[in-house]
C-alpha cells in the first residue's frame, strides 16, 4: 500500500512539472498558469501562500476583466479534468479563499461564469483509489455545494456576509458570544419584505454549512480540517446575521398580514431548529485539532412561550395589509364622523359684522354666513341620488310606456270591451245587435256585468281575472256554447223534441267544423252530380256481377230504398272510398238492417 501511494505521488509530481513546462511555453498568462498549477499540485499539503497571493493580484480590480475570467476558466478546467481528491480540494480552497479575501470582481465574474459553466457542480466526482480518497471525495462534494450556495446567497443579498465586519471585541474572538443589539448587521436595518426574501437564503446557506461534517477517514485528514476551518469562520457571521434578522423580524411580526406572518413564523421555527443543529456541529468540531485555535460561541434558543404567542396572533391576523395601517384608517374615519356630527349638532349663530369684517380683512375672503353654508350642505345632501337599486323589476315590465298608452287609447278595436262600472259611449251598437238577433256572447262582450245585489248584504266576490278579464263573462260564453250544441243535436234528430226554427246564429268562435267539408244543405255543381251518378252506376254494376252478392228480394229492396233515401238529401262524397258502399255479405244481413233502422231513428 505504501508503495502504491509513493507511486501515485511520483506520477502526480511528473504531471505537475509537465503542466508547468507547457504553461511556460504556450500560455499567454504564464505567471498565472504556473501559480494555479503550483497552488493545486498533487502534494497533500495546504496551498502555499505566495501562490495564492499571486492569484489574488491577478484577479484584483486593477486587472482587466479578461484576466479575471481567464483565471476562473483555468481553475474550472483544472477541477473538471482531475480525478485526484487532493487536486480537487486544493482548487476549492483557492476559490474559497479568493471569495473571502479577494476582490469583489472575482465574485461577480464567478457568479456569471457559474450560470454558464456550472464550475462548482461536481456531484459525480469520486476518487476510489483508497478508503481515505473515497471518504474525502464525499466531503469534497459537500464542500462544493456549500460554495455554490454561497454564490447564490450573494446573488440574493447583493453583498457578501464576510465583508460585514463585526465590532471590536465580538465575533469569533470572544468565548461566549452574546448576540445582542451591539452587534449590528445589515439584516437589522432591513424592511419586512427584504427580510422575508433574504433570511431564507441565509438559512439555506447555514444548512449547507452544517452539512460540511467530515465522516470516516476524512475526520482526521489535515487538508479536510484546513478547509473546514474556513467554513467554521463563516458560520459565526452567518449565524449573527440570521440572529439580527430574526430580532428585526420579531419586532415587525405583530404588524404583518397573515400571509407574511406565516412566512415569518416558518423562518422563526427554522432558526430555532438550525440553532440546535449548529450547536451540535460545534460540539462535533471541538474534537478536531483545529479546535485549539477556535473559541466556539454559546448559542441561545428562543423561548417557546413566544412561539405560542406568534401562533395565536396568526389565527387573528388580517388577511392583507398591516394592523397599524388598519387602525390608522379606523381612527381617521372615527374622527371624520365626529366632526360631521359636531357640525350638524351645533346650531350656527350669526356672527357680528365687525368680527366678520376683521376676519375677512385678515384672510382676504368674502363674507359668507354660516347659516347659508349649512343650508347649502343640506341641499346638496338632499340632492344626492340614492344608491338603492330596486331589483324586483329587472326587465322593466312595470314601467308604463307613454307611447304604448297613447296607442291603446286610440285603438278602435278595443271599444267593445269595457271594465265594470264604466258606461258605454252609446246604446246604438247594443240595440243593433239585439235587433239582428244577437244573443249570449255578443251581449256579454258589450254589456257590463252588474254584480251588486241589494238583497245580498255580503260583498260580491272578486270575479276579475289577470289582465282585467271578467270570470262571469267566461262562464256565460261556456254556457252559451253548450246551449247551442244542444239545439244543433235536437235539430239533427239526436235529441227529444221538434226542430227549433228560431235558432240563434252559431257562434263563429266555437265552430268545430272542417272548413273544407262538403255542405249537405247546398246542392253541388252539375259536373260533381254527374260524377256521383257515374260512381253509383259503377257500384251497382259491381254488386250485380259479384257472385257472392246474392240477397233476397226483400233485403235488396230495403237496401235500395235506403240508398235512395240517403242519397237524396245528402249526396255522397265523390272523393270517398267506393268500397264503403258495398252491401254486406248474406250472413250479416240481419244486423246490418237493424243498424240501418237505428240510424234512421
Swiss-Prot record:
Residue ranges for the region (Disordered) are 319-390, 548-601
Q: Do you know which SUPFAM superfamilies this protein is assigned to?
A: ENTH/VHS domain, GAT-like domain
InterPro entries, per the entry: ANTH_dom, ANTH_dom_sf, ANTH_N_plant, AP180-like, ENTH, ENTH_VHS
**Compartments where found:** Membrane, Clathrin-coated pit; Golgi apparatus; Cytoplasmic vesicle, Clathrin-coated vesicle
A GO MF label: clathrin binding
Q: Which Cys residues form disulphide pairs?
A: none
Which GO terms of type biological process are on file? clathrin coat assembly; clathrin-dependent endocytosis
Report whether Membrane shows up as a keyword of the record: yes
Keywords of the record, alphabetical order, are: Coated pit, Cytoplasmic vesicle, Endocytosis, Golgi apparatus, Membrane
Determine if Ribosomal protein is one of this entry's keywords: no
Where primarily located?
membrane
Cellular component terms per the entry's GO annotation: clathrin-coated pit; clathrin-coated vesicle; cytosol; Golgi apparatus
Domain (ENTH): give its ranges: 24-161
Acidic residues compositional bias, start-end: 331-342, 367-382
Name of the protein this chain belongs to: Putative clathrin assembly protein At4g25940
**The species this protein was found in:** Arabidopsis thaliana
Amino acid at each position: 500500500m505504501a508503495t502504491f501511494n509513493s507511486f501515485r505521488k511520483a506520477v502526480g509530481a511528473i504531471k505537475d512539472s509537465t503542466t508547468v513546462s507547457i504553461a511556460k511555453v504556450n500560455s499567454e498568462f504564464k505567471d498565472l498558469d504556473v501559480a494555479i498549477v503550483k497552488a493545486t499540485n498533487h502534494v497533500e499539503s495546504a496551498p502555499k501562500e505566495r501562490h495564492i497571493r499571486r492569484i489574488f493580484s491577478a484577479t484584483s480590480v486593477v486587472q482587466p476583466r479578461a484576466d479575471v475570467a481567464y483565471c476562473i476558466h483555468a481553475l474550472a478546467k483544472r477541477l473538471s479534468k482531475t480525478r485526484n481528491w487532493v487536486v480537487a480540494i486544493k482548487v476549492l480552497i483557492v476559490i474559497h479563499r479568493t471569495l473571502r479575501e479577494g476582490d469583489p470582481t472575482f465574485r461577480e465574474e464567478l457568479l456569471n461564469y457559474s450560470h454558464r459553466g456550472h464550475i462548482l457542480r461536481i456531484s459525480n466526482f469520486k476518487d476510489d483509489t483508497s478508503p481515505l480518497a473515497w471518504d474525502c471525495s464525499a466531503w469534497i462534494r459537500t464542500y462544493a455545494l456549500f460554495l455554490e450556495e454561497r454564490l447564490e446567497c450573494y446573488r440574493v443579498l447583493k453583498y457578501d456576509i464576510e465583508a460585514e465586519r463585526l465590532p471590536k471585541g465580538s465575533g469569533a474572538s470572544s468565548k461566549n458570544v452574546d448576540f445582542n443589539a451591539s452587534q449590528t448587521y445589515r439584516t437589522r436595518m432591513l424592511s419586512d419584505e427584504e427580510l422575508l426574501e433574504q433570511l431564507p437564503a441565509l438559512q439555506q446557506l447555514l444548512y449547507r454549512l452544517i452539512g460540511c461534517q467530515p465522516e470516516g477517514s476524512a475526520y482526521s485528514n489535515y487538508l479536510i480540517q484546513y478547509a473546514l476551518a474556513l467554513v467554521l469562520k463563516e458560520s459565526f457571521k452567518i449565524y449573527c446575521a440570521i440572529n439580527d434578522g430574526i430580532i428585526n423580524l420579531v419586532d415587525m411580526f405583530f404588524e404583518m398580514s397573515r400571509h407574511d406572518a406565516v412566512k415569518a413564523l416558518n423562518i422563526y421555527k427554522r432558526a430555532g431548529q438550525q440553532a440546535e443543529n449548529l450547536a451540535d456541529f460545534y460540539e462535533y468540531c471541538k474534537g478536531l485539532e483545529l479546535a485549539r485555535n477556535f473559541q466556539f460561541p454559546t448559542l441561545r434558543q428562543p423561548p417557546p412561550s413566544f412561539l405560542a404567542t406568534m401562533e395565536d396572533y396568526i389565527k387573528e391576523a388580517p388577511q392583507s395589509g398591516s394592523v397599524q395601517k388598519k387602525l390608522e384608517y379606523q381612527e381617521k374615519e372615527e374622527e371624520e364622523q365626529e366632526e360631521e356630527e359636531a357640525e350638524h349638532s351645533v346650531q350656527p349663530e350669526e356672527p357680528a359684522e365687525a368680527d366678520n369684517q376683521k376676519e375677512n380683512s385678515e384672510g382676504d375672503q368674502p363674507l359668507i354666513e354660516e347659516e347659508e353654508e349649512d343650508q347649502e350642505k343640506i341641499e346638496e345632501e338632499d340632492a344626492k341620488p340614492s344608491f338603492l337599486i330596486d331589483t324586483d323589476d329587472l326587465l322593466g315590465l312595470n314601467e308604463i310606456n307613454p307611447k304604448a298608452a297613447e296607442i291603446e287609447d286610440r285603438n278602435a278595436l278595443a271599444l267593445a270591451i269595457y271594465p265594470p262600472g264604466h258606461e258605454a259611449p252609446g246604446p246604438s251598437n247594443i240595440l243593433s245587435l239585439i235587433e239582428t238577433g244577437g244573443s249570449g256572447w255578443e251581449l256579454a262582450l258589450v254589456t257590463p256585468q252588474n254584480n251588486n245585489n241589494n238583497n245580498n248584504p255580503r260583498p260580491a266576490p272578486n270575479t276579475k281575472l289577470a289582465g282585467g278579464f271578467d270570470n262571469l263573462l267566461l262562464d256565460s260564453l261556456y254556457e252559451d256554447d253548450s246551449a247551442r250544441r244542444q239545439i244543433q243535436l235536437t235539430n239533427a234528430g239526436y235529441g227529444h223534441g221538434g226542430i227549433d226554427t228560431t235558432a240563434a246564429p252559431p257562434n263563429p268562435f266555437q265552430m268545430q267544423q272542417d272548413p273544407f267539408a262538403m255542405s249537405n244543405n247546398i246542392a253541388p255543381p252539375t259536373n260533381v252530380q254527374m260524377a256521383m251518378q257515374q260512381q253509383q252506376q259503377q257500384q251497382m254494376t259491381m254488386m250485380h256481377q259479384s257472385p257472392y252478392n246474392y240477397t233476397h228480394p226483400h233485403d235488396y229492396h230495403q237496401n235500395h230504398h235506403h240508398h235512395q233515401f240517403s242519397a237524396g238529401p245528402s249526396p255522397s262524397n265523390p272523393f270517398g272510398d267506393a268500397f264503403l258502399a258495398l252491401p254486406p255479405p248474406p250472413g250479416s244481413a240481419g244486423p246490418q238492417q237493424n243498424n240501418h233502422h237505428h240510424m234512421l231513428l
